[in-house]
Design a protein with these regions (language model features):
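Short microdomains enriched in Cys/His and/or Lys/Arg
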Residues: 65-76, 160-172, 234
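Electrostatic cytochrome c docking/interface patches
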Residues: 21-41, 53-56, 110-135, 214, ...
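The canonical Cys-X-X-Cys-His
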Residues: 38, 42-52, 108, 131, ...
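The feature marks the first
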Residues: 34-77
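Extended amphipathic alpha-helical interaction segments
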Residues: 120-151, 155-160
C-alpha cells in the first residue's frame, strides 16, 4: 500500500475517532479541583517535564490538550513505552501507569495545556533555507505552514517542540523505536513518512522549525556567563 493511500485511510479513521471522543475536560477539572491528587500528579510530572529539572524530559507547557491526552493514553495502555531499548519512553510508560483513570489523565493534560510556553535552549544546527524548503515539501501539508498542527489529521503542533527532542523523536520514528505498534495509527504514519529522510535533512528541518515558529530561545549557562565568545580556534 503506498503512502498516499495510507494517508487517506488514516484521515478517515481519525475523523471517525474524534467524532466519538467525549468532552472530558470540564468534568475532569470539576472532579479533581477540590483534591490534592491532581497537584500531586502534576508535581510528579514536573520532576522531568520542565526546563529546570534533573531528569530531562521534553517541555510540555502549552501543548494541545488533545495531543497530550492521546500520548498519555498510549503510554498508559502500552501502545508506547514498551521497548526497554527505548529507555526514555520505557520510563515514561512506567510513570504514566500511575495515572488511575481518564479523569486524572485529562486533568494532567489540561494543566499542561493551560500553562504558558517555556523558553528552550537551541541545540540543533542546520541550514534554515534547506530546512524551510524540505518542510514545505514534506511536512506542511499535515502540520501546517507555521507548524500549527491539524487535529483532524492527528497532526500535532510543532510550535512547542524543543530542538533536541524534535530531532530525537524523528530519529526514533525512522529507526522503528516509535510508531511500531499496530494501534499507534499516527505514529505509524510518521514512521512511514520518515523512512527516507537523511540525518542532514532532519537537522535542517528541525533547525528551521525551531527558528521559524518554535519556543522562545533561552540562553545556555555558557552564553549567559560568557556572552562574548572567544574567536580563538581552541
Amino acid at each position: 500500500m503506498n503512502t498516499l493511500m495510507q494517508l487517506f485511510i488514516f484521515i478517515g479513521t481519525m475523523t471517525l475517532v474524534f467524532s466519538c471522543v467525549p468532552d472530558v475536560k470540564k468534568d475532569s477539572v470539576v472532579l479533581m479541583s477540590d483534591s490534592q491528587r491532581g497537584e500531586t500528579l502534576v508535581a510528579e510530572c514536573m520532576l522531568c517535564h520542565s526546563n529546570k529539572e534533573a531528569q530531562r524530559g521534553p517541555i510540555l507547557h502549552g501543548m494541545e490538550m488533545w495531543y497530550l491526552m492521546d500520548q498519555l493514553e498510549k503510554f498508559r495502555s502500552g501502545v508506547r513505552g514498551k521497548l526497554a531499548s527505548n529507555r526514555s519512553e520505557y520510563l515514561m510508560g512506567v510513570g504514566a501507569r500511575k495515572i488511575k483513570d481518564d479523569f486524572e489523565l485529562a486533568y494532567v493534560a489540561n494543566w499542561f495545556s493551560e500553562q504558558d510556553p517555556l523558553p528552550a535552549i537551541r541545540t540543533v544546527q542546520g541550514s534554515l533555507e534547506e530546512g524551510k524548503k524540505y518542510f514545505n515539501q514534506r511536512c506542511a501539508s499535515c502540520h501546517g505552514g507555521n507548524g500549527e498542527g491539524n487535529r483532524l489529521l492527528n497532526a500535532p503542533s510543532l510550535q512547542r517542540l524543543e530542538g533536541w527532542y524534535f530531532l530525537e523523536q524523528m530519529r526514533k520514528f525512522r529507526s522503528g523505536e516509535r510508531g511500531y505498534h499496530s494501534q499507534d495509527i499516527g505514529g505509524q504514519a510518521m514512521a512511514a513518512a520518515s523512512q527516507e529522510i537523511s540525518d542532514r535533512n532532519l537537522r535542517n528541518v528541525v533547525a528551521y522549525c525551531v527558528d521559524a515558529f518554535g519556543p522562545e530561545e533561552e540562553l545556555s549557562n555558557r552564553d549567559r556567563l560568557a556572552p562574548n565568545k572567544s574567536v580563538k580556534p581552541f
